[in-house]
Amino acid sequence: MNRNLLIALSLVPASLVFAADPLYQAKGDHARTYVHPNAAEPQPYRIFVPSTWEPGKTMPLVVVLHGGGSNQNTPFERNDNILAKEAEKHGFIVVSPLGGGPSGGYGASYAPVFAPGANRPPPNPGATPETPARRISESDVMMVTERTAEEYGVDRKRIYLMGNSMGSMGTLYLAQKYQGKWCAIGPSDGPVVPSSYEYDRVTYLSGAIFVHGDHDTLASIDATREMVQSFRKAGIETKFVEVKDGTHTGSWADVLPGTFDFFDAHRCGR
């Protein structure tokens, strides 16, 4: 995302940015939109704010990236909206951006690592040379993160990032690009080529929790295992949760309480 644009946005008073939004500082589960300066139409995102939040109260934030072919609502639809339930229980604000579209890639250029014999989908836009759509996808995540942090006064030292499949690759990409932005990360069922990753760029993280289902027939669990070892060698506290009978799309939700526990235990800035 253009750094000058981020600086300019940070100087705009919140009262002006949200003046026309009837859901400004609303609690609960809501569908929201905002105007992205480079997108053809308003960009949607989904947000959950715990009932215990009130103006002036600081809470941590979890940014959740959906998988390819999905949208900002998909993470909330798994396991009877366990995402909102765990956020309420742990006292976290959760936001899920669209990322510019169902398969925007969040700016990542990594090639996916498939499981042996996987029925490979068409190439993901996230694995192609940089395009305007990819730039919008990346900046959408960062703008929604900033918008939410400004609106709800979140603890900026406790912003966490997680995602599944394409969202996992986006998580890994944004973690190494925006150093110091994230406290800890949670990639699931979406490794990148282990030898291609810049582990030295994520040593600032307080921790990483990787999740992968042992019945994932699309993404390589062996590649995830290799990434876990490389994270540990880089000195990052790393947990690996291998989900028994876990599938490509559902494993992350099956063990989500543990992911929130992990994030809650990793409190940056203290």
Predicted regions and their residues:
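Serine-hydrolase catalytic machinery in alpha/beta-hydrolase-like enzymes
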Residues: 31, 38-44, 57-153
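Primarily recognizes the serine-hydrolase "nucleophile elbow" in alpha/beta-hydrolase
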Residues: 77-79, 146-153, 157-204
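Positively charged n-region of N-terminal signal peptides that target proteins for export
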Residues: 1-4
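Bacterial N-terminal signal peptides
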Residues: 7-15
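Alpha/beta-hydrolase
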Residues: 65, 187-188, 243
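Alpha/beta-hydrolase fold active-site loops
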Residues: 60, 92, 183, 206-207
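C-terminal catalytic histidine-bearing segment of alpha/beta-hydrolase fold enzymes
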Residues: 208-211, 217-270
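A domain-start/cap signature at the N-terminus of enzymes
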Residues: 17-61, 129, 137, 166, ...
